Amino acid sequence: MNKFEKEVNANQVMMMLVNNTQLRVSDVASKLYLNKDKARRLLDWMVNQGYIKKKIIKYVGNANLNIYTK
């Protein structure tokens, strides 16, 4: 995914965050028609750029849930 595609997808993710305060990787993947790996990379790139914040919810055992917020 080049920089232009990342910026376009980032704008769509920001519009998704207007309606929902929290997003999961699967939400972004289904909305943008990406596989989960590309959606995860896009969201991590957005975290590194400072657009969004990442929160990790730990469950019993080794289960983690990544939640992305504004």
Q: What kind of feature is each model-predicted range?
A:
Residues 1-14, 60-62:
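Short alpha-helical segments that sit at the start of domains
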Residues 6-7, 21, 36:
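Alpha-helix N-cap/helix-initiation sites
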Residues 3, 33-35, 51, 67:
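Short, low-complexity interaction segments enriched in Ser/Thr/Pro/Gly
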Residues 15, 26, 44:
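Residues within the helices of the helix-turn-helix
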Residues 47-57:
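A short, conserved structural fragment
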Residues 34-45:
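Short amphipathic alpha-helical interaction segments
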Residues 58-70:
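Minor-groove-contacting beta-hairpin "wing" of winged helix-turn-helix DNA-binding domains
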Residues 19-31:
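Short acidic, hydrophobic short linear motifs in intrinsically disordered regions
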